């Protein structure tokens, strides 16, 4: 990230910096009280903070649910490309919803916020990496609502400041990240087969 964009705290390439709210098309937090819908043989998934880390969403140990057919479920059902950010406990963990996760039928809990961005200007994976950088982490810490129980609200998320390079450069970065991820999978598979 730093090699391509420079240190975001310094912004040596002098990219424009704006509040995230300028690029948010949809913003919601997850559902409370879904324990009654969580079952071992549920047909859909329920994302919690433990699934969101390092700009990714892990399907390992994903909670199974049978979601209700109501407005709350429709509001908290994720779509491909949604950016998820933890807003309680371990603040600022990020992940981007993949096609596989979205197609499975997946919802978020109350400890996460779901953001749909204007993808013509900001790539969600670029934003995830920015938020996981030192510059992003410092903002989460400064906006933390309480010293006793960590938490962020919609205003905190909307007011996050982000460096906005041209979308072509963001896409180049995302292509590189995806290629590295593919290479890691190939190496891991080879290691697993060697054992």
Give residue ranges: language-model regions.
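Non-catalytic DNA-recognition/assembly elements of restriction-modification systems
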Residues: 1-31, 159, 163-171, 178-195
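A generic structural signal for short beta-strands and their flanking turns/coil linkers
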Residues: 43, 61, 109-111
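A short beta-sheet element
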Residues: 48, 73-132, 149
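Short, basic/aromatic beta-hairpin or loop at an interaction surface
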Residues: 51-64, 106
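A short glycine-rich beta-alpha junction/loop motif
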Residues: 104-113, 125, 145-171
């Amino acid at each position: 990230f730093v090699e391509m964009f420079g240190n975001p705290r310094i912004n040596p390439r002098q990219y424009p910096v704006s509040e995230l709210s300028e690029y948010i098309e949809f913003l919601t937090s997850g559902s409370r009280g879904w324990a009654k819908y969580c079952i071992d043989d549920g047909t859909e998934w329920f994302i919690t903070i433990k699934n969101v880390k390092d700009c990714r969403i892990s399907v390992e140990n994903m909670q199974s649910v049978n979601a209700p057919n109501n407005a709350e479920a429709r509001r908290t059902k994720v779509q491909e490309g949604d950016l998820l950010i933890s807003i309680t406990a371990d603040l600022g963990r990020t992940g981007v919803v993949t096609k596989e996760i979205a197609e499975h039928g997946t919802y978020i809990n109350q400890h996460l916020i779901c953001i749909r961005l204007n993808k013509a200007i900001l790539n969600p994976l670029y934003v995830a990496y920015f938020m996981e950088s030192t510059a992003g982490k410092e903002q989460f810490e400064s906006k933390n609502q309480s010293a006793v129980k960590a938490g962020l609200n919609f205003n905190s998320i909307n007011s996050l400041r982000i460096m906005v390079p041209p979308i072509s450069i963001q896409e180049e970065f995302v292509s590189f990240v995806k290629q590295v991820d593919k290479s890691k999978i190939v190496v891991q598979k080879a290691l697993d087969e060697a054992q």
